[in-house]
Amino acid sequence: MIEKLKNWWKWDPEAEKNSADNPVTALTDNQRRNTGPLLALAFGWGFLVTGLFTGSQLGNGIPFWPDIIVTTFLGNLANFIVGAIVGYIGYKTACNSGLLYRYVYGNVGAYIPVLFISILTIGWQGIVVGAFGITWTLALNPGIEAVDDIFSSSTFIITAILAGILYTITTYFGVKGLERISIPSVAVLVLVGLYAIYLNIIQAGGFSGLLSLSSALVAESQMTTVEAINIVIGSWIVGAVVMPEYTRFAKKGWVAIAIPFIVLIIAQWFLQILGALGGVVSSDSLFSAQLGIDLNILMQQGMIIGWIGIIGMSLALWTTGDANLYLPVIQTSSILKKPKNVMTVICGILGTILGLGLYQYFFEFLNLLSSLVPPLIGPVIVEYYLINKEKFHSGSFDGIASWNPSAFIAYIAGAVSTYYSPAFIMPAITGLLTSMIIYWIARKTLTR
């Protein structure tokens, strides 16, 4: 038994290189994935509870039509552009983010952005674990009336831990495991989502009733259109930044662009609209307050329909949970030189522990992510598209410096700029653009 554990823990670069997930080098053509399963995986990843939360927040801040439809589209479009730019680098180089950071931040310097993003994405995993626990706690304990009662409930603790174990087991099988759960889940997620939209509109008394409810709800709101767009951008800009983890598997360029399109323009936009409906129709519901959607509306349609809704929500969180856990696993495996399976268990345990207490700070955590992560990718974008893309295709890190001061100067400038962002632009975009500009200047100046 001890010998098996030693072998499991042991780093075998050749075995990792030849695995389906290959965290240590650029993928070979044989390691790229078929289009259908990869796009299904993207849809499952995009079905993240953030969309419901974001939509619910907007539903309580601006009119549903046409404001919410337009602002959510524009915000998702901005994230899609970033995701497509970054994701295309992943496709062309076949490299995960950890490898891309080595080319730009240096062989040693890359440890800082990789470990930083990994810690934050493990925290993101904790958010999804907590959401699963909340879903089942509210479903099994309809009498709960206070938020504190949710997190102290034994039902929450047990179901959150089970969710963490479930996500870890699926991710243990790598991208193949993610595809297997995503493919059958897509149809269920779409059907449940569409039915929930239909029921919300019926609950409001039709579309005209919905618009009347929306107008009355936001009559005293001070939220502006720009603020609404910024909320949407902040909710998924981090997902756009880590896009190479999945686009590297694409066999064709259009697939690399389709992945962020499906995640952001289709899945997230769909969820934001559903969440906005929930925010308008059920603004006083504990379900809506904690998950962005009131599953009680489905429960009122009968036990079968209600539990289909609960299971659909659970599937959405499952496909999101394992796809999120995969991100820090690949990044840490590539930089720490530990087997992917080992990092899956470690990251899964950490995410599960965080899931028991982090969900209460969802919006604070989201703001932290959206401010600190985007500037990290700015130097990668500039280096690839404007300075020296050839080195990304060399397949070797020989000759790469241990540290690249230009990248760290650019990141610090970008991160600081998020706190001084003008009101008309999202801090995340300010940070990203600042890091790109400063990196280009520093790279041209310091390398003369």
Annotate each PLM feature.
Residues 378-448:
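C-terminal membrane-solvent junction of multi-pass transporters and transport-like membrane proteins
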Residues 59-62, 87-88, 104, 112, ...:
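Membrane-water interface regions at transmembrane-helix termini and the short interhelical loops
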Residues 1-66, 216-229, 248-253, 445-448:
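Membrane-interface "cap" regions at the ends of multi-pass membrane proteins
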Residues 35-52, 199-204, 214-278, 301-322, ...:
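Hydrophobic, membrane-embedded alpha-helices of multi-pass small-molecule transporters
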Residues 129, 134-138, 188-214, 228, ...:
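Hydrophobic alpha-helical segments and their helix-loop junctions in multi-pass secondary transporters
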Residues 41-45, 114-115, 142-173, 187-196, ...:
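Transmembrane alpha-helical segments of multi-pass small-molecule transport proteins
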Residues 158-200, 260-264, 365-378, 429-437:
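Membrane-interface loop-to-helix entry segments
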Residues 48-51, 74-82, 117-128, 188-200, ...:
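Selective recognition of specific alpha-helical transmembrane segments in multi-pass small-molecule
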